[in-house]
Amino acid sequence: MAIKNHILGFPRIGLNRELKFALEKYWSKKNTLEELLLIGKNIRKENWKNQIDSGMDYVTVGDFAWYDHVLNISMMINNIPERHNPNNHILNIDTLFKVARGSKGVDNNICSASEMTKWFNTNYHYIVPEFTSNQKFYFAWKQILEETDEALSLGYKVKPVLLGPLTYLWLGKVKNSKINKLDLLKKILPIYIQVFKELSSRNINWIQIDEPILVLDIPKNWKKEFQSTYKFLDGKIKILLATYFGDITHNLDIINKLSIQGLHIDLVSSKYDLLKLSKSINNNFLLSLGIINGRNIWKTNLLEWFYKLKDFMKINNNFWISSSCSLLHVPLDITIEENLTDFVKSWFSFGIQKCLEISLLSQVLQNNLDIKELKNWIKPIHEYKSSNIVNNTSVQKRTLKISSEQFIRKNEFSVRSKIQKETLCLPVLPTTTIGSFPQTSEIRKLRLDYKNKKINQLDYEKQIKIHIKKNIIQQEQLGLDVLVHGEPERNDMVEYFSEYLEGFVFTTYGWVQSYGSRCVKPPIIVGDISRITPMTVMWSKYAQSLTKKPVKAMLTGPVTILCWSFPREDISKEDICNQIAISLRDEVLDLENSGINIIQIDEPALREGLPLRTHEWNNYLRWAVKSFKICSSGVKNSTQIHTHMCYCEFNDIMPAIVDLDADVITIETSRSDMELLEFFKTFKYPNAIGPGVYDIHSPNIPSVQSIEKLLKKALKYISIQQLWVNPDCGLKTRNWTETSLALQNMLQATLNIRKEYFKK
C-alpha cells in the first residue's frame, strides 16, 4: 500500500497578512526590495513547514505569487505587454507590478494595467495574459526554479506546480491582432520543456500541471491540442495533471489518451461515484483524490470518506489524497481565532487543519491510527446539525411564502423612467460614483476603536456623520449629479451587511487573497438568515438631509453576499439566497420610506456564481435573477434601482442582466477599453447603463482626454439618453488626492461631451 499526502496549493498571504503589508509598503516606497523579498521568503518557509508538520509527504512549490499565479506564467515566458517593457529589458519584480497595477511610461504617459478578471467561478482575480502577433517568448523569469532550490535546501521533498500551457492560453486575450491563441503553443511549450529539464536535474520526480479548463465545455480544436501538447512534454519528469472546480467525465476521452503519469480529480465539486469513475480512467494513471474541500471551511466527514476509500482500495491501493483544489481560497489557521466560541470553532477547518484532515485519514487507512480518531474528528459535524443556531422556523415559513408578485416591478422600464426623470431632474450623462470613498487611516482607526469599545456608540456615530458630511461637501464641490454617503462605516461590502443578519458568524483572522495585496475576510453562513435591524437607513437618511441632490443608497445584493461568504452546506444555495433577498427587500423598502429615491443593489458576483458547465446556467440564472428581483421589486415607480457589476464577462449572461430589470446598471469596462460594449452592436440594452470610464484599481490619474475617448466609444453603442458616467468601481482603496483629481477629470470630460452633444 502506498498512499501519499499532498495539497494543490497553500494560502500565500501569511498568517497575519504579511504579504499584503509588505507589498503596500514597497509600492509606497516605505520598504526596500530586499525587505519585500525577505518577507516573501519567510512566508514560503513557514508554509512549507506547516505542510510537513501537518503530515504532507510533499511540499507544494510554485503556488506563491507576488501578485497572481497566472501573472507568474506570463513573467516566466516573457509575455509582457510592450507598453510595460518597450525596450525588452530584463524582467524584474517591478515589471510584474507594472503589468498588474499600471504605471507611467515614457513622457509620463499612463500605461494601463492589464485586465483583471475572476479565476473560474471563485472570488480570486487573475491578471489576464495579452497576446499579440510577432511575440517572442523565452524563459525569462525563473521564480519556479529559485523557490524549488529554496525548498530543497531546507531538506523537503518537493512537488513543483505550474499552470498548464493550454489553460494559460485559454485565459488570455488576443489584442489588436487576429492570431489564433493555439498557434502560440509551439512557442510556449519549449519553455515548459526547459523548466522540466531544470527540475529533473534537481532530482524532482513529480510536477503538478494545472489544467482546470478540462472541467469546461471546451471546443474540439482545443481538445485536439491536449494530446499533442502532453506528448511533447512527456519524458523529462512525471506529470500530475490537476483538474478542479468541476466534473471531467465529459472530457475523459481526451484525458485518458494523454501522456501523463498522474491525474488529480476534484471529488468535492462533482459528486462522483468513485468506484465507477476509477473504472473509466486510464489504469496507468496514478490517481490523486481531491476529497478535502479547498473552497469552503467546514470540517470534512472523514468517516464517510474512510468507508468510501476502503472500498476503493480493493481495486486500487496506490493513490494520493489531496485537497480538491488549492487552499488559496480558505484562511490559514482556525486555532488563532479568538472571538468564536470553541463550540463554533470546532465546526471548521482552515488551511492547516485541511492538511491535518488529509494526514489523519491517510494514517487510519494505513492502520497507523485507530478509526476512533475519525469518529472523534467528526463529532462537531453532528453537533452542528442539532444546534439551535442553525434553524429558524419563521425564516423558513417566510421563504416558502415567496410569490411571483414579489419579484415583478409595478410597471415596465419605459413607464418608470419617465416618472424617475420628473422626480430626479438629472441632466443628460448623469455623473455618479459607485459608492465608497477613500477609507483613510482615521476612518479605520475610528471603526477599530468602536469595535474594541474604546469609544461609545454615540461618539462613534457622531464621528461617522462628520465623515459623511465631508463626503457630501466634496461631491457637491466637484459637481457630481448623484451623490453617495461614501460608506465610512463599512469595513467590507459583505461583512458589514452580514453583521446585521442573523445566521452569520465572523472570524478575526480569516483572511483570503482576492488579488495582489487585496484580502477579504468572508463571513460564514451557519444558519437561517434574517435581518436583525435596519442596516443602512440611518446613514443614507442623514446624507440626504445634507443636500438637495439625490443621494444613492448602497446595498450588497443577495448573490454577492452568498458568493463572497463561506456558505452552509446542508441546504441549497438557492434557499440561502432567497433568505438573504427577503432581508434585503425589507431594507430597500425602509430606505424608500425614509425618502431615498435611488437605491443601488450591487451584484458584482452574479457572473462569478455561474456554473462552469453551460447546461447548468439556466437553473442558476433563474434563481439568481429571482433573488435580485425579490430585493428590488417592492418599490414605487419613482424609485430608481441601480446595480453594479465588475470583473467579469457579461456578454454571455446579458439576457439575465436584462431580466434583472434594474433601471441603471454600472459595469467595469475601462481596463478592457470598453471592449465589453462590442456586444451592444447587435444587442440593444433597454435600460440605462454606466460603463466605467476609469480604472480605480490603478493609482494612475486618468486624463480628461482618455475619459472623453471612452465616452465617445460608449456612445457608439449606447444612446446618450441611456448613458451614465462613473468610475469602474468603489473608491475605498484610493487616497483623496487620487480620487479628487480623477473625478475632476471625469466631470470635465462629461461637460465637454455634453457641450459637443448640444452643439449638434
Curated annotation (Swiss-Prot):
Residues annotated for L-methionine binding in this entry? I434, G435, S436, E487, D602
Pfam families from the entry?
Meth_synt_1, Meth_synt_2
Query: What molecular function terms (GO) are annotated for this protein?
Result: 5-methyltetrahydropteroyltriglutamate-homocysteine S-methyltransferase activity; zinc ion binding
Q: Please state the Enzyme Commission number of this protein.
A: 2.1.1.14
Sequence positions that bind 5-methyltetrahydropteroyltri-L-glutamate: R17, E18, L19, K20, K118, R518, C519, W564, E608
What InterPro entries would the database entry show? Cbl-indep_Met_Synth_N, Cobalamin-indep_Met_synthase, Met_Synth_C/arc, UROD/MetE-like_sf
Q: What superkingdom does the record give?
A: Bacteria
Which pathway or pathways does this protein act in?
Amino-acid biosynthesis; L-methionine biosynthesis via de novo pathway; L-methionine from L-homocysteine (MetE route): step 1/1
Q: Which GO terms describe its biological process?
A: methionine biosynthetic process; methylation
Q: Which UniProt keywords apply?
A: Amino-acid biosynthesis, Metal-binding, Methionine biosynthesis, Methyltransferase, Repeat, Transferase, Zinc
Question: Into which family does the record put it?
Answer: Belongs to the vitamin-B12 independent methionine synthase family.
Chain's role: Catalyzes the transfer of a methyl group from 5-methyltetrahydrofolate to homocysteine resulting in methionine formation.
The identity of this protein, by name, is 5-methyltetrahydropteroyltriglutamate--homocysteine methyltransferase
Organism encoding this protein = Buchnera aphidicola subsp. Cinara cedri (strain Cc)
Q: Which gene encodes it?
A: metE
